[in-house]
């Protein structure tokens, strides 16, 4: 259920431009948003308003676009909003999905000599900087008894990271679904570790401050998103086929993604989730991977409308 928000962030009035269109940043791999786009459910709930879908390769790019006003709303993993807030970007957390700890992993070649996380020492690890894979790698390195300086991170977007991994330019690849599932289905990888026990792999929805002031639009968005998730859960084969065709993925890959994915209703950030996200920020700050410490609660949306707070 939508309950009272956590933190001190308060929304301002929406900008006049927000009444004309709603621009959503998404990754093709974000199933709920992809299905929402395919169903047209949001467009039906916002008659007379143009919904613009803008595709990005990963969460950091979505939040950069959000920060400069190119999109109004987007979904990312745990690390991108931490990096954005530390860089002074004015964004608000407006919702979160349940954890998906089995949906990201560190991959190696089947015949690689790496057998434990400690074996990452001195190795080149491909990952998207500032992404959930970045936090997974940080946690994995620590679990292996290593310092961050003990590995050689190679910062690449997902498609470039896969190419580097396949040609042997890197020793390991930290990645999330559906890229993870696609690599598994292709059979040319071995899982060194998943994020289970290392990171909950949370998904967050973030909005511009102006959109956060338009609670009716956010209410419509989350209602439509619930409709998309119900479609995924209630018509799994149909949804899988639609998503596979849309994303250019094999059906087996999408079904593998769905096996690891529980129902994903969006809810406000609870105090526990804010604390968990604060830990993500603190870990990055201690390692000097973000320019300054941050207080996550300062960027958590506080809806004014009691109907929005109770919205499910």
Cite the ranges covered by each PLM segment.
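N-terminal twin-arginine translocation
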Residues: 1-15
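Short, glycine-/small- and polar/acidic-enriched structural segments
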Residues: 11-144, 153-155, 171-175, 191, ...
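Solvent-exposed, polar/charged alpha-helical surfaces in well-ordered, non-transmembrane soluble domains
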Residues: 40, 44, 64, 68, ...
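Short polybasic/polar patches that bind polyanions
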Residues: 47, 85, 142, 185, ...
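Pocket-lining segment of extracytoplasmic ligand-binding domains
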Residues: 79, 150-154, 159-246
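Periplasmic-binding protein-like
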Residues: 97-108, 184-211, 222-225, 260-264, ...
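Secondary-structure end/capping motifs
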Residues: 213-291
């Amino acid at each position: 259920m939508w309950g009272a928000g956590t933190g001190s962030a308060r929304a301002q009035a929406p900008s006049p431009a927000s009444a004309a269109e709603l621009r959503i940043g998404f990754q093709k791999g974000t199933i709920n948003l992809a299905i929402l786009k395919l169903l047209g459910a949001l467009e039906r709930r916002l008659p007379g308003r143009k919904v613009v879908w803008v595709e990005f390769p990963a969460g950091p790019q979505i939040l950069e676009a959000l920060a400069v006003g190119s999109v109004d709303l987007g979904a990312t993993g745990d690390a991108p909003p931490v990096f954005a807030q530390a860089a002074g970007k004015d964004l608000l957390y407006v919702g979160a999905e349940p954890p998906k700890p089995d949906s990201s992993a560190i991959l190696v070649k089947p015949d690689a000599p790496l057998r434990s996380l400690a074996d990452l020492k001195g190795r080149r690890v491909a990952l998207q900087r500032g992404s959930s894979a970045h936090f997974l790698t940080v946690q994995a390195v620590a679990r292996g008894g290593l310092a961050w300086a003990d590995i050689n991170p190679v910062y690449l977007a997902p498609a470039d990271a896969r190419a580097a991994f396949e040609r042997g330019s890197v020793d390991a690849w930290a990645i999330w679904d559906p890229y993870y599932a696609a690599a598994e289905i292709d059979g040319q990888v071995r899982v060194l570790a998943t994020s289970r026990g290392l990171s909950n792999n949370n998904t967050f929805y973030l909005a511009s401050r102006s959109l956060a002031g338009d609670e009716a639009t956010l209410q419509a968005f989350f209602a439509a998103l619930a409709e998309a998730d119900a479609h995924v859960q209630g018509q799994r084969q149909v949804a899988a086929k639609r998503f596979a065709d849309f994303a250019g993925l094999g059906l087996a890959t999408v079904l593998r993604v769905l096996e690891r994915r529980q129902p994903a209703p969006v809810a406000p950030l609870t105090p526990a989730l804010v604390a968990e996200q604060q830990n993500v920020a603190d870990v990055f700050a201690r390692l000097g991977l973000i320019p300054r410490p941050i207080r996550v609660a300062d960027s958590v949306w506080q809806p004014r409308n009691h109907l929005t707070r109770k919205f499910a």
